[in-house]
């Protein structure tokens, strides 16, 4: 079965993340490295779905883990119609020039049934940094 023939799920959100280093907000001499990341959430399902909350797992270059939980994304709980995309940019300060983020969006379908959308791990790295 090809991707085009794949059955459409009632509730299916696709997440893509584009991270970047923010040198103008970073101060390596103070062990402060700031990263921005732009997230695109697209409703690839056949019914409306709403992002209710988020859970991030942030790991720095020393393997220290921080978990962040909160309502919505950038102060919103976007309701996405089928085919609709919501995009936002946020930031993450780290004490190391490299790290990773991964997480989960907690969502609800129009029927009130909750579901989770995994956010694949992505790399936060200062340019020209070897791991």
Swiss-Prot record:
Pfam family for this entry, one: DUF525
Family annotation (PROSITE patterns): APAG
TM region positions: none
InterPro entries: ApaG-like, ApaG_domain, ApaG_sf, Uncharacterised_ApaG
Annotated ApaG domain residues: 7-131
Cited PANTHER family: OS05G0170800 PROTEIN
Name of this protein: Protein ApaG
Species annotation: Bordetella pertussis (strain Tohama I / ATCC BAA-589 / NCTC 13251)
Gene name as annotated: apaG
């Amino acid at each position: 079965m090809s991707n085009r023939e794949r059955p459409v799920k009632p509730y299916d959100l696709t997440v893509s993340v584009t991270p970047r280093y923010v040198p103008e907000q970073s101060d390596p001499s103070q062990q402060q490295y700031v990263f921005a990341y732009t997230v695109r959430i697209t409703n690839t399902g056949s019914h409306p779905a709403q992002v209710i909350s988020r859970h991030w797992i942030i790991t720095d270059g020393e393997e220290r883990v921080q978990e962040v939980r909160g309502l919505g994304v950038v102060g919103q709980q976007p309701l996405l119609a089928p085919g609709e995309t919501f995009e936002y940019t946020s930031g993450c300060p780290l004490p190391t020039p490299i790290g990773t983020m991964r997480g989960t969006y907690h969502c609800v379908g129009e029927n009130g049934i909750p579901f989770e959308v995994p956010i694949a791990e992505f790399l936060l790295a200062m340019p020209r940094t070897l791991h």
